[in-house]
């Protein structure tokens, strides 16, 4: 008799997928908004757009991202409830850069084997971060890929949509000479540069359970620190009457892949130059540790890691005090780190690299000067 081959024998466990959905239901239900229609398990997530239709000229903003090789740290430690939090930060915080309010998000998880508790932990992290960001988690997909991924391997990605009034879009033409550059502290490495970090610690022979005095915890715990999610606080900042009265926020930049200078250059218009003084802040210990362990050149570390700055806000001088006070009150340490100049009159330091428009954006330029405290 010819042997029967089932889907389960091919490596796909439908029942495990169903169990994962049951385990994640409670957390997903908390990550919602009043506009969400329908429930978990539908073919499509639905979002009532009535309020959007009442806007003068609504513009939708969308973003897609992942968490890169940080998942390898989570897999090595078998800790999966923070990687979803990272995913939300990477996706929804990009949307806020243009002034939009993130509304809803979907996720995608590909794995070699569905372990219900692991999938539920990942989605639980996504849901917690969505709840914090005031974003609805309206759907997702878990795909089992036996033979393509090892049983303990997975990757995840997400996509989100937001909305902004056309008149309120934070475009580069809002930024002016004399604007002040504010740094918003990161929670650590966030979710960029982990291929470099992993290579460095492997080269140094450091185990993830190594206690690191400078961190006050293990290396693995430091590397899995969740990405700070700025979305809700920045949406509120853009609408705060005291900040608006001082001239409002002129620009925002999410410091992700490419580092501080490159991402700041993306939001500057041609003809403007930003000078950022490293002496205005001290990066958390993890950045110096990675650099010294791997003998990583300064230029490379700054093109790869956020160096303790997760977001940048550009504001007129009259809005500096109200903006920093607002963000400090929300638990986001914020400080003055530089200023915007006319490119023709900018104080260029010949000893430091000037970064011009990055990632395909033909914009302004940025120079990091000085040394960290």
Protein language model regions, located:
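Short, acidic Gly/Pro/Ser/Thr-rich loop/turn segments
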Residues: 17, 53-54, 67-70, 165-168, ...
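Buried hydrophobic packing segments
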Residues: 24, 46-49, 91-92, 197-200, ...
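Glycine-/charge-enriched secondary-structure boundary and capping motifs
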Residues: 2-9, 118-136, 149-156, 214-222, ...
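Residue-level signature of catalytic and energy-coupling elements of molecular machines
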Residues: 13, 65, 178, 254, ...
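Short, acidic (Asp/Glu-rich) active-site segment that either coordinates a divalent metal cofactor
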Residues: 64, 155, 168-220, 261
